[in-house]
Amino acid sequence: MQKFSYILIFLLILVSCEEIIDWDYEENPPLLMVVDGKITDQAKAHKIRLTKPVSELNDIPEPITGAEVSILFKQGNDTIENPLTEALDEPGTYLTDSSFQGITYKYYALQIKHEGYEFLAIDNLRESVPFETANIYTQADNGLYNVNFIYGAFANADAAIWYFNLDWSHLPDTVYAPNGTKKARLAFYSLPSIDVNGLFLSGYETVYFPAGTKIILEKYSISESYAEFLRTMLAETDWRGGVFDTYRANTFTNLSDGATGFFGACGYLADTVVVQP
């Protein structure tokens, strides 16, 4: 009985010592904007796309219009500002002047001002290392050809985005034309890291093409942070190619709080190959 009394007194003490504690915690800032775009060392009009976030993969993102968008870089002690202009026929797409050309190894900042908010992203423009075009396609059992994605020049390449632009529209009408088309564009990524070879395809369908096809192979060399963005993006999605419309919470970004996506600065190289029988 005495033991029970001790237990009862102990419980009463615990109850009397209860105190309501208001925990302080930081909420993630609201996601206001998705940024998708890059500049290169080509002299051309470069595109930056601004949209509102969506919650479902198949939702169509709403373009963000009326933003003030600029690209900044240092030149000596001065900061040079290059304002972008919103495309009249494509709301939410902002263009540099057609003469704008990035410089290798220079850091570039994207500055966005919209409805009282300001967002910033920074990336370094990497040099694009030359690549070999031999053996980039192989003949299939059906007599047609397909891209040789496992070719060593790609699997062992530096971090880059690659595009195969295939065109055999100049060949006779009797030539192979699936779905009535004689063109295709394929994308893949070489994203080397410590634990994987980092070769990612942008789809699972094999595209066949005939001898005589013209292949324009484009390479965009990317920074380590751009590669990290793509790794996390590919890890979070069932990647089939296309525009990144939905961003998960843990996807890497170089945008300041309130925005996601990526602003990239890339070195660019391209070469043309004609498929020989």
Regions found by a protein language model. Give the residues of each.
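Sec-dependent signal peptide recognition
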Residues: 2-9
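Enrichment for repetitive, rod-forming helical segments
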Residues: 9-10, 192
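C-terminal motif of bacterial Sec signal peptides marking the signal peptidase cleavage site
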Residues: 13-16
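A sequence/structural signal for flexible, mid-protein segments enriched
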Residues: 18-277
